[in-house]
Amino acid sequence: MPGSFLPVTPEEVAQRGWDAPDFVYAVGEAYVDHPSFGHAIIGRVLEAAGYRVAMLCLPEYHSAEAFKRFGRPKLGFLVSSGVIDSMVNHYTVARKRRNTDVYAPGGRAGLRPDRAVTVYCNRIHEAYPGIPVLIGGVEASLRRFSHYDYWDNKVRRSVLVDSAATLLLYGMGENTILDCCDWVRRGMPAHELPRLRGVCYMAKQPPRDALLLPSHAEITADKHAYCRAFLLEYQEQDPVRGHTLCQQQDAQRYLVQNPPALPLTRQELDRVYDLPFTRLAHPMYDAQGGVPALQEVRFSISAVRGCFGACSFCALTFHQGRIVSSRSEESLLKEARLLASFPDFKGYIHDVGGPTANFRQPACDRQLREGACKNRQCLYPTPCKHMRVSHTELVSLLRKMRAIPGVKKVFIRSGIRYDYLMADKSDQFLTELCRYHVSGQLKVAPEHISPNVLARMGKPRREVYEAFVERYNAVNRKYGLNQYLVPYLMSSHPGCTLKDAVELAEYLRDTSHQPEQVQDFYPTPGTLSTCMYYTGLDPRDMQPVYVPKNPHEKAMQRALLQYRNPANHDLVREALRLLGREDLIGFGPHALVPPRTIRSSAERYSREKAASRAKSAHTYGSAPARSRVPASHRTDRAAPRQGGRRAGAGRKGGGR
């Protein structure tokens, strides 16, 4: 049953009979006691272990005074920027400041600083020099090594160096936080540091058994060295076979990354999600309109963690890992019954999912024994012959969930992997999905159709997507359903040329699809695609990769994906003429744009869009794609939207 909120004021600390908290948890977002928010899970896990935790959410950061609010904690501070990297949260891919922040009271922007982890740590050091500080969450996790920073356009050192924190906890860290807090409680014995899984620390010498990465100085000076470092980091993020890694940060200090924490077992996950969350935003935000991010997940259920899809632009490998773990059927049904008991529940469970909704188990039996394969992906370029493909457990779960009294509909709004679904010869899951669990639109992510671009993205071939579309439409026709597909599309990904963008535009023309918004590739820390963006090399084969960086070319690529919009016609014509594709300029059935902008075309475009939507539902099953903050920061189920789909990163289970 729901409990009470953790204390947020000194008065609430005193009411609990505490002389001081053990830890003060500084977080760069509003306090929402819901298991979709990392600070809520970490706080409840520590509370269940007997620790006294006070929440310091969105502290005023221009001085150290706010960090003295609870006095000096007995053991130390915990710091996280929130479920999304603060720079991703604050800026668009064009480096323009966002106007809203759905993780803040009333959606108000500007309440957290840029590079929140570092700023908070600096203020803590000012307030209490020498006190232990543990940092975690997406921002810390994805910036644990020296990394390319898109906003500074340079290679930055590990955030552990910049923040001067005691330890950096990476990944989904329920067990890691308990191990580290116990280590702090016992006086921080240095000889025990190498035993702490999921932890990074600074050392004067590299451990004898560590793999030595190219140093910060080397990767700053040599992009080939950057690629070698990234590939080692990428390949060793495995809890079973991963090694200790070490990277020299400066003349005197080495960053040491211990092997990743083991994925939580099903029983451990069940215990975490059974903790007494209120599932509400703290009432101190009510007068400001609450916290918008909660509305997206208020009646959603997190079912799985991890993803073996391995898209190049996604940071899941670096944060949650490739080994999927999931909650038990009974745990999920228990949560569904709890949601159905709430007075404001309207009968609709908005999502049952995770990073990928139709993954429920590790890709194969070998993963838990030997780890995920170092040089082979489970689904790309083709599904591995050892991969277990089954939706039986998921179908059983969904049938029982929709039979719960008070539940009218159970939606699946997390993305599904259509290549995994296509590997399942049975139509059972797809049939049930279409009949009972689609809210008029199903999200899928083909991203592109050019073979060259898909290869760099690590996405399945165009033919796989087209076969899925046919299968999806056939099921909908069979049951008389009029349901859309929402394909997410990306422009300007490394490897994508203007020619590739034209190929995608022709595909959209031929399928009568009109994406209203598309996502420009966003280079964020911790992804293979960002490595390609910075170096111009694919670290997997060290081959050169074309990288569109010129803002005008990127605008042309984006315009080609929305070629029907009259506002884009000049850019589209320019791109087509550059490529010698004047055959696509004109009034014929194959033309993308007219020779000149026609009067009143904007009004006609609006009417055609509405008609095309209706037509596409019958002819191709497609609906307009929506924009998104980068998939690289979707670190569990799709995070609450802020101007569209939000990936990476950010979520929401432990390890924050």
Q: Locations of the language-model features?
A:
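N-terminal [4Fe-4S]-dependent radical SAM core
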Residues: 1-20, 30, 225-300
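Glycine-rich beta-alpha loop elements in corrinoid/cobalamin-binding modules
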Residues: 11, 38, 57-250, 257-258, ...
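Conserved SAM/AdoMet-binding glycine-rich loop
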Residues: 25, 41, 56, 60-61, ...
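N-terminal pre-triad scaffold of radical SAM enzymes
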Residues: 26-31, 288-315, 348
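Terminal amphipathic helices with adjacent charged low-complexity linkers/tails
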Residues: 62, 190-238, 252, 261-264, ...
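Conserved, mostly hydrophobic/aromatic
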Residues: 166, 272, 307, 332, ...
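Acidic, low-complexity intrinsically disordered tails
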Residues: 376, 594-656
